[in-house]
Amino acid sequence: MLKIYCDGACSGNPGPGGWAFIIPELNIERTGFVDNTTNNRMELTAVVEALTCISATTSISKTKKVEILTDSQYIVNTMTKGWRKNKNMDLWHMLDYLISFGWIVTWTWVKGHADNVYNARCDELAVGAYKNRVVVKNTKSVWERLKEMSVEEFAKWLYTNLYKLNSSFGSYSGVTNESELLKWLNSKS
């Protein structure tokens, strides 16, 4: 089972915030910054970004078993105890959508600011992201990761990340699956 450590941080609530996740087994650390947000949104964004990242990696997505380790009781209790999802619905919908691809997720709460080295590192990255206004930082550049992907893996990655693309790249509203995305990409070249 792949372990993923996630954390979010916010200066003020609301205020500038950062998120981070670490996948030690794959040597992946990713962080991001949002100008005006809440701590719960940042905690949840870290999880959504982590699942988006691994969904695009074919070798991982075949196993479909992950453990999300977070110091957010908000996330763990919502996912394991049926707490009501009445705020941050856009992120909860995205999380549900990502999980619907067959991920088997174990949700584990870890004590924050304790002796867990990966949780401490996630906190450091998340705080650093909002203090330094780091939009997105990866251990491998996007281009390095894209060059390693097959066309099919790239289509899956792109399809998973369509919601992030700037609309100036053209309309992709008719794209509903990876094969249609390949056709759309070919029509643009």
Locate the predicted segments by residue.
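RNase H-like nuclease fold core
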Residues: 1-41, 45, 52-59
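RNase H catalytic domain
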Residues: 4-13, 48-138
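Short interaction-hotspot residues at assembly and binding interfaces
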Residues: 153-189
